Amino acid sequence: VFVSADEVCTPWVTEVIKEATKAGAYVEYKLSSQEAREMQLKYSNDEQLRHGDLIMETILEKADVWLSAWGGRNTRAFTNMDAEILKKSQEGAKKWRRFYSDRMGSGELRWCGTQYPTQSDAQEASMSFSEYEDFVYGAGLLEVDDPVAEWKRISAEQERWVKYLDTKSEIHIVSEGTDIKVNVKGRKWINCDGKANFPDGEIFTSPVEDGVNGYITFSFPGIYAGKEVEGIKLIVKDGKVIEDRKST
């Protein structure tokens, strides 16, 4: 069992290691640091950025289970980092990401990720820390009498929608700034009921590769690697984005 998280999530990591070890698992773990990562990115040359992560590659090639938590001390830690540096670093992560996706797809690797409440994420959500804790734990239904039974109930309800959507071939989404058609004929809908992402409550599929046409506008900002973009609009033709716009 591989356990990974930012160092701010150490209490979660500690408890997971304890319970997994008691259950008989052989545990490996990795605690990351935003400060250390910043220095690594800032002072690496192109070859070093693309070198990859030997720890992740080695572990994910062999692990049976990967448990991870999201949460850091600073949601904007890499906002001012050059986008090209981040791009080259992502290229270096391709090998371990391939191990992850291939082994997840084959069933060799089981994964589950969850949110760990942090002060920075509470601030991002415009909540006090205690409010954010209640929000996260409430989303996981951890305070109901029988969380497992409740997630099984949600799974059954979502499965009803999965069976309904499996009979559909096209989805047409229309709203303010959005008019897009998605071909899902022959695609399999997946019931996400807490076994991978936790908490969950999602039903998803993928479109036919050349079967998306129209435009979509996002009313909320897109945030990636600490960079925030407002007013995103994508224009899609035959499954490819042919134009993108943003306000900031």
Short names for language-model regions:
Residues F2-N213:
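Active-site bordering "gate/hinge" segments
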Residues P199-D244:
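Oxyanion-binding "anion nests"
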